[in-house]
Amino acid sequence: MKDLFLFSNLLNHSHAFVYAFHFCLVALIILIVAYIARSKMQLVPRGLQNIVEAYLEGVISMGKDTLGSEKLARKYLPLVATIGFIVFFSNVIGIIPGFESPSSSLNLTLVLALVVFIYYNFEGIRENGFFKYFGHFMGPNKFLAPIMFPVEVISHLSRVVSLSFRLFGNIKGDDLFLLAMLTLAPWFAPLPAFALLTLMAVLQTFIFMMLTYVYLAGAVAISEHEH
């Protein structure tokens, strides 16, 4: 039923094309926003530059609170801020009738979760060394190490599942809710729903970015605590 509302169906009806088309559209929007914000930069921010700078400062503040270091927060800013842009615009675009949320596809959310998973483990190994990082999985008690290590490995792998399915499930549910509202009352009744779904899109973006910083904090915490 949702396909009836999609403009992309004018080009191709396949689900793979629909999600690829809307992800490319999201990427284009992000590039345009970045270009406009950078092309007219002023000492006193105005317009879009002001919004983007406020967003970046908010991400840095979030990272500082999570990591306990502004230096580390700025170090991981490009990753977290980029993921935030992708998740936000992927969520919001689906609220507009005729468009689909790329984040309502498990493919995208799984890729984003894998990027976070691979990167924070890479940072953990780079900061602490291979043996020290994975040795931390065994816990402080050597006798419990054979039990703790597989438990920790499973716990870390489950983060990929929780990150991807949380975002996918929430946005897919939002899409179905919006579809029901548009079907039952296509004009004025969905307006409160649009506001609620926008709030949910922002909330899911915040959660994804926060968890990214939390996982990074856990990965680099071994060496940071020693310093």
UniProtKB/Swiss-Prot annotation:
Transmembrane domains' residue ranges: 16-36, 79-99, 105-125, 176-196, 202-222
Pfam family membership, one: ATP-synt_A
InterPro entries reported in the protein's UniProt record: ATP_syn_F0_a_bact/chloroplast, ATP_synth_F0_asu, ATP_synth_F0_asu_AS, F0_ATP_A_sf
Entry's localization field: Cell inner membrane
Membrane topology: Multi-pass membrane protein
Entry's Gene Ontology cellular component terms: plasma membrane; proton-transporting ATP synthase complex
Alphabetical GO biological process terms: proton motive force-driven plasma membrane ATP synthesis
Subunit structure: F-type ATPases have 2 components, CF(1) - the catalytic core - and CF(0) - the membrane proton channel. CF(1) has five subunits: alpha(3), beta(3), gamma(1), delta(1), epsilon(1). CF(0) has three main subunits: a(1), b(2) and c(9-12). The alpha and beta chains form an alternating ring which encloses part of the gamma chain. CF(1) is attached to CF(0) by a central stalk formed by the gamma and epsilon chains, while a peripheral stalk is formed by the delta and b chains.
Family listed: Belongs to the ATPase A chain family.
Protein name: ATP synthase subunit a
Protein species of origin: Campylobacter concisus (strain 13826)
Gene, per the UniProt record: atpB
